[in-house]
Structures are given as C-alpha cells and as structure tokens.
Amino acid sequence: MANPKNEAALAELKAQFAETDSIVLTEYRGLTVAQTTELRRALGDDVQYSVAKNTLVKIAAQEAGVEGLDDLLTGPTAVAFIKGEAVDTAKVLKKFGDDNKAFVVKGGYMDGNALTADQVKAIAELDNRETTLAKLAGAMKGNLAKAAGLFNAPASQVARLAAALQEKKDA
C-alpha cells in the first residue's frame, strides 16, 4: 500500500478500532451532507462516524481482532465507532433510519460478536444501562420494604397481643 493517504487512513482506522467498545456499519448512499452532519450531531461526542474504504476497514478490523464484518463491507460504508453506551447509539441510528429511508444499518460488532442489522435494531429497543439499573434498584427497594414489614410484623403482633392481655386483666 504505497499511497500515503491510504496509509494515514489505515492508521486512523486502527486507532479507532483500538479505542472503541462497539461499532455499527451503515450505508450512507443517498444522504445529503446536511443529513450526515445532523446524524453526527445526534450521535454526540462518544461516537466517531467515519466514511471509509471497505478494504481499509477490513484490514484494520483484522489487525484489531474483529471478525465477521467481511460480508457487511460492500457498497458505500460508514462506520460508527462507539466509545460509550451502544444502546443509546443504536437508538439514534434506528430513529435516523426511520426518518431517512436512504440510510441503512448494515450490522455491527459488540462484545466480540458480529451483529446483523436486525440485531442492531433489537439492541435499539433495549433500555440503556442507567434505566436498567434504576429499574433494578426500584425492584430491590420494593422487595426490601416488603421484607422489613414482614420482619417487623411478628414484633408488632406480640406487642398488640400483650396490650390486649393487659387490658383484659385490668377489666
């Protein structure tokens, strides 16, 4: 690969693969520059959305140990390198795809597994980490309150029984 532009692009892709937690591959054909800019803005700072040559993405992925993307790397491809919450990014990409029919999610890679487009869309339907933890904490709090009431019940019942016996003796 004698082309210095390709070498620089490959080095950048390798760095992004090394720093990322998950990726989503998309097809951007038919999108305007304004739509792409809108998508980048919606994705936020934790996602690097880059258009790249498929051959360079394949090489960088192989060198990073990311497997299973070869079938997805056809046609014009843009890669969303996700450094944060993958669920939030999947939600943004799904909504953008619903609003812009030219935009297509091809698939992705998360936790050592290649993902199909349907799997990425299924991830978009999940609650994010914070919401899941809040639901878990709420469920635990409710059960702990019930348990505390259950443990306190025998003591209060004994106290009421003793008070009733005292009243009966006094009468």
Curated annotation (Swiss-Prot):
Protein name in the entry: Large ribosomal subunit protein uL10
Subunit record text: Part of the ribosomal stalk of the 50S ribosomal subunit. The N-terminus interacts with L11 and the large rRNA to form the base of the stalk. The C-terminus forms an elongated spine to which L12 dimers bind in a sequential fashion forming a multimeric L10(L12)X complex.
NCBIfam families to which the protein is assigned, alphabetical: PRK00099.1-1
Presence of the UniProt keyword Nucleotidyltransferase in the record: no
Keywords assigned by UniProt, alphabetized: Ribonucleoprotein, Ribosomal protein, RNA-binding, rRNA-binding
GO CC field: ribonucleoprotein complex; ribosome
InterPro entries: Ribosomal_uL10, Ribosomal_uL10-like_sf, Ribosomal_uL10_bac, Ribosomal_uL10_bac_type
Keyword presence, rRNA-binding: yes
UniProt record similarity statement: Belongs to the universal ribosomal protein uL10 family.
